[in-house]
Amino acid sequence: MIPSATYRIQFRNGMTFDRAAALAPYLKDLGISHLYASPIFTATSGSTHGYDITDPNEIDPAIGGREGFDRMVKALRNAQIGLILDIVPNHMATSLENRWWRDVIEQGKNSAWAHYFDIDWTRPVTLPFLGDTFEIGRASCRERV
């Protein structure tokens, strides 16, 4: 079915699969043909958007996991509403919560996951992490110079 009217759901921040499932009858009454879902894969702890994936093989337990996803899909089918997923395959978090990234940091180019990341191995990998907000980090750097 070709989408004719989509409704976007931003999962996280209290929006779960079960809450989206409960909206299905209302969306049907509005004439919505498809639910357009924000990323659903496991993201960094506290992610507000889901574009910082840490496990592309797991539906995020924080928004209902696989079981919640299946309940939502069933509710959408019952309402004859399609589902469009924003899968963001090019958005993997550079966080140690991401086991692929953590392995690359630990094993370097010998990591089984090294080819998944665009890393120039001809020079040392630089990871510029601030220990605080940008403003505080910048002020701290000025104090040391």
Regions found by a protein language model. Give the residues of each.
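Catalytic cores of glycan-processing enzymes that make or break glycosidic bonds
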Residues: 1-144
